[in-house]
Amino acid sequence: MTPPTTTNLLRGAFAVTAAALAALLPLAGTASASPFTGHAHRTVTTADGETFHLRLTAESTLLPAAGGTVDVLGKGYNRAQGIFLAFCVIPDGVRLGDPSTYTTLPTPCLGGRESTDGSARRITDQGTGTPGVTIPYEKGGRFTTTLDLEPEIADGVVCDTTVKCAIVTRADFTATSSRLYDQYIPVHFAPAHKG
């Protein structure tokens, strides 16, 4: 009998890891049951010279095939500028983590422009907006909320099938053309379990 080689040991370890992940995916029924967390951050300077360190965190970024609820936390945002938090198609040309490529409005988004299905929020201190959709910033430009996500953004626009999708922040309708607050956390959906 010959001793196992490093290559054989690595193959075995990879097989065990892959099997463990395959066993976990069907159990990820809710965001809280999944260990996958996404992060985005960038530092921005406004025309007034103020600097903001934007941080965005989402739990979970791997959802069941039918969708699920994701907990989202933001901090460091400019309280003088409202933002939209939504689930959108990642525009062509955007390279995640490279804000110099964030030149196009993220669209389409789940729920459309006037979403009331829990798939989007407007965060603002202006005090106007749709109850349950519009929420105020907390101290330090923070916000904590949930998003209810599903893979079909619109007819024929399906995440992980026809497009790539992400939880995004962007300036609200008071500054739609500004890309200063754009951030992306990609989200994926586990394949439907056959059997």
What is the predicted role of each segment?
Residues 2-12, 22-195:
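Extracytoplasmic/secretory-pathway segments with low complexity and glycosylation-like composition
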